[in-house]
Curated annotation (Swiss-Prot):
It is an enzyme of class 2 (transferase). This is Acetyl-coenzyme A carboxylase carboxyl transferase subunit alpha. Acetyl-CoA carboxylase is a heterohexamer composed of biotin carboxyl carrier protein (AccB), biotin carboxylase (AccC) and two subunits each of ACCase subunit alpha (AccA) and ACCase subunit beta (AccD). It comes from the Bacteria. The lineage of its organism: Bacteria, Pseudomonadati, Chlorobiota, Chlorobiia, Chlorobiales. GO terms for cellular component: acetyl-CoA carboxylase complex.
Length: 335
């Protein structure tokens, strides 16, 4: 049985839950022994402890710092792109290769169908997303979700294919960054990302980008130019990770918490700055506490957004996308 991953700020809650579980076991044993007084006493203690657990759970997860949200976004049990695809969509057909160099397993994509009988909605989409692994072997296979140039070129090939068949594009963003290796630079990492930004801006089909976990720098925005940008409540999106920011500014990773605060990288921060359009609420404690509920929420919002975007003509889609990104940022003009 896999060991449960407990983050540092979750330890007090985990310890209390362990104590609660032990008491429930004792209650079960006590009930079997027909010890009525002991059973009643344990039941009362359990009720009190359950209230404490609920109160502590809300106190922790409703008051997360920016750094704690970064930690949740990186949680190894969090649902990844393929999890969302199989929970939200049907008939997924993965397409491989960039037709130039090779196939990148850190960035996957293909046609799939989103169906929602309650809303009378059915639509084939091109879904593209970063894919991480859950253990050492799969992480090496997926390169820890860090895409190579061939991954971004594959993504662009699939987007152009979607445009050819007039199908919307849905991207799922979850990466610690584009792969920074020498080989990636030799193969044109910067050019591949820049080309995607240019081409995505002009796609004549609806494009929806969903930040489901980590959204680091060019690795994220390489598939992140959309008409609508949705962001999970405990995801992060920034030009740099808190650790890298800390190492540049303070020559040490020790100041990552301060860096996270300064970067303003949470969904709330980015909604306020009008960089993202909607925040996707997560189950209390993070998406990994109820992946199916999280996938249902994402699917519901995708259906809502797709229905609206599919009514727009291609020229409006392109113009709105360009205007959206041109309006981002804050600057001053001196006379």
């Amino acid at each position: 049985m896999a060991t449960k991953v407990v983050l540092d700020f979750e330890k007090p809650l985990f310890e209390l839950e362990e104590k609660l579980n032990e008491m429930r076991v004792c209650l079960k044993q006590s009930s079997g022994e027909h010890n009525l007084s002991e059973t009643e006493s344990l039941s009362r203690e359990i009720e009190v402890l359950e209230s404490k657990v609920d109160a502590l759970r809300h106190a922790i997860y409703k008051n997360l710092t920016r750094w704690q949200k970064v930690q949740l976004a990186r949680h190894p049990e969090r649902p990844f792109t393929l999890d969302y695809i199989y929970m939200m969509m049907q008939d997924f057909v993965e397409l491989s290769g960039d037709r130039h160099y090779g196939d990148d397993k850190a960035l996957i994509g293909g046609f799939a169908r989103i169906e929602d009988e309650e809303r009378d909605f059915s639509q084939t989409v091109m879904v593209i997303g970063h894919q991480k692994g859950r253990d050492t072997k799969s992480n090496l296979y997926r390169n820890f979700g860090m895409s190579q140039p061939e991954g971004y070129r594959k993504a662009l090939r699939l987007m152009k294919l979607a445009e050819k068949f007039n199908k919307p594009v849905v991207t799922l963003i979850d990466t610690p960054g584009a792969y920074p290796g020498i080989k990636a630079e030799e193969l044109g990492q910067a050019e591949a990302i820049a080309r995607n930004l240019f081409e995505m801006a002009g796609l004549r089909v609806p494009v929806i980008c969903v930040i489901i976990g980590e959204g680091a720098s060019g690795g994220a925005i390489g598939i992140g130019v959309g008409n609508r940008i949705l962001m999970a409540e405990n995801a992060w999106y920034s030009v740099i990770s808190p650790e890298s920011c800390s190492s540049i500014l303070w020559r040490s990773w020790k100041f990552k918490e301060q860096a996270a605060e300064a970067l303003k990288l949470t969904a709330e921060d980015l909604l306020e700055q009008k960089i993202v359009d909607r925040i996707i609420p997560e189950p209390l404690g993070g998406a990994h506490h109820d992946p199916e509920k999280m996938a249902d929420t994402v699917k519901s919002l995708l259906v809502e957004e797709l229905r609206m975007l599919l009514e727009k003509n291609p020229d409006d889609l392109v113009n709105e996308r360009i205007e959206k990104f041109a309006a981002m940022g804050v600057w001053n003009e001196e006379e």
